[in-house]
Amino acid sequence: MSITNNMESPSDSEVRLTLNDRALWTKFCSLTNEMIVTKSGRRMFPVLKLTASGLEPNSMYSFLLDFAPADSNRWKYVNGEWVPGGKPEPHAASCVYVHPDSPNFGSHWMKQPVSFNKVKLTNKGNGGGQQIMLNSLHKYEPRIHVVKVGGEAASERTIATFSFPESQFIAVTAYQNEEVTSLKIKHNPFAKAFLDAKERPDQTDFHSLAGIPVSSPQVPSWYGRNGSTSSARHFTHCNSYGGESELTSVQDTAIPSYTSRNCMRNSYRGNARATPYTIPHKELTCQATSFPEPVPNDGFYPMFPNSELLPRTTLNNYSPAMGAYTNSSIVTSSDIQSGNNNNFFYSNNNNINTTDEVPTTYMTNDFNSFYNQSSNSGMPGTTYLPYQSSPVNQFYSYQPPYSTEIADISPTQQDIINAQNPYQTAWTPPLSYDGCSTMYNSITPYSSSGESTTSEMTLLATARYLQNLRL
């Protein structure tokens, strides 16, 4: 450490600055340290931190930083080492960086290390503010000036200037020495994204998963500015706090990547996914509902309700579930069941015993809708009447007072025509499959002679009896 004192009082001779992280700076110095300079400015690593002592606690001080040329050479990197490469460029007057805490009391500077972590190095002029312009491929040495503010003359004066030889570096636009690159990646917290994929346990080799060989490089090696080559690939890196940290690189030559002199906000190409992410989803399933299904025009029914994708079967095997028809609405009758064991009906019960349950005739108060509705069940001999959304609705199975031979009579198209014109000769009301006469209101059939026949009166009485049961 070199000190230049401009002492005017005995207390000024006691001012001392100690370089923090001296061991780390020494490692970089042994490898010839490199610092990145860019147009927009790049922060230093290692960060220049110092511990102050010997300041007057109640006096005001300012801390300033500038960079002085360490020699009169221009440098180049050849065959893995830095060698002088010609005369230097004219050195412009170096800008001075003023610490943002300046001016402040001596007690403030001594209670914690003085850190110059916000200074940026640039290779373009007129940076101003936090930027200091340096010439690329030139060696520099940082200098810290301690300025005392105030006093009797109310002026500023520099009381001491400190420099540290182990902090010397060569300004570069891209790292040349791989060992310097590795050391910065290892110690710089903002360069962890550029660690070798083999050294990071949380990395996944997506190239091997996709069957892509990683041994063959996909980009040419980097060529230096002076014609020298380097197998390292060079990157710049932006930290997540808005500022920019050290330029870092990747050692693993097996993973291809691009070279860049600009700030890369993404990690190297080897970390890219070879295959896109999969989107988890639920498999859509077809669910049956409890609503009746319209009758297909081709005379066949699907095996399950509301599913046109499944195979169809004939009417004899069709038994879908319908919420409107429950077991509570079925009245068993062993006498009627003797002629109807082969019939099927709608039910919500999966375990149907056809030996005890019988099909049902469904009743309505609307006579016209009775004849205008087509059979939704599609079964021969069964007439479907629209379901009335009323709490009074109940469905019954009724055993008629006449023989089962009449119960086997099915309504025909002529029966329906006759029912629509009840005053014609030899009118016979249509019958359901189980022998129950179809319900109607305010219809009194007469024969051509004007008197009701015995058969017609029997059917009329049966119809009225079933209406009373419904009410």
UniProtKB/Swiss-Prot annotation:
Developing notochord. It holds the Pfam family T-box. Its main location: nucleus. Residues 24-196 bind DNA. GO terms for biological process: cell fate specification; positive regulation of DNA-templated transcription. The keyword Nucleus applies. SMART domains: TBOX (SM00425). It is found in: Nucleus. GO terms for molecular function: DNA-binding transcription factor activity, RNA polymerase II-specific; RNA polymerase II cis-regulatory region sequence-specific DNA binding. Keywords: Activator, Developmental protein, DNA-binding, Nucleus, Transcription, Transcription regulation. One of its GO terms (cellular component) is chromatin. Involved in the transcriptional regulation of genes required for mesoderm differentiation. This is T-box transcription factor T. It comes from Halocynthia roretzi.
